[in-house]
Amino acid sequence: MNEKKVECVLTGTVVSSNRDKTITVLIERKVRHPIYKKYIKRSTKVHAHDDKNECICGDLVRVVEAKPFSKTKHWSLLEVVERLVSVD
C-alpha cells in the first residue's frame, strides 16, 4: 500500500514576522455565493515555520502543510515568491 500523500501548498502574504522562526501568513481566496452568484473574498491567517527568519512583512510566500510544530503552527515556509521592495 504505497499511497502518495498530496501536499497542500498555499500562497499568501506575510502580515507578521515578530516572533522567532514564526511568520503569520494571510491567505485570500474567492468563493462564489450560492444564491447571488457573486464572488466574495474570504481570508485565513495561518502560522508557518520560518527556519532561517528570512521573511519580512509584505513578502509573497508559498507555504506547505507540515507536521505540527506547536499548538497553532502546522505549516512550513516553502519559498519566498516575491520580496517586498522597501523605499528608503
UniProtKB/Swiss-Prot annotation:
Key words of the record: Ribonucleoprotein, Ribosomal protein, RNA-binding, rRNA-binding
Organism this protein belongs to: Vesicomyosocius okutanii subsp. Calyptogena okutanii (strain HA)
Disulfide feature: none
Endpoints of the signal sequence: none
Gene Ontology molecular function, alphabetical: rRNA binding; structural constituent of ribosome
Quaternary state and interactors: Part of the 30S ribosomal subunit.
Protein name: Small ribosomal subunit protein uS17
Family: Belongs to the universal ribosomal protein uS17 family.
Function: One of the primary rRNA binding proteins, it binds specifically to the 5'-end of 16S ribosomal RNA.
Any single GO CC term annotated in Swiss-Prot or TrEMBL for this entry: cytosolic small ribosomal subunit
Gene3D superfamilies associated with the record: Nucleic acid-binding proteins
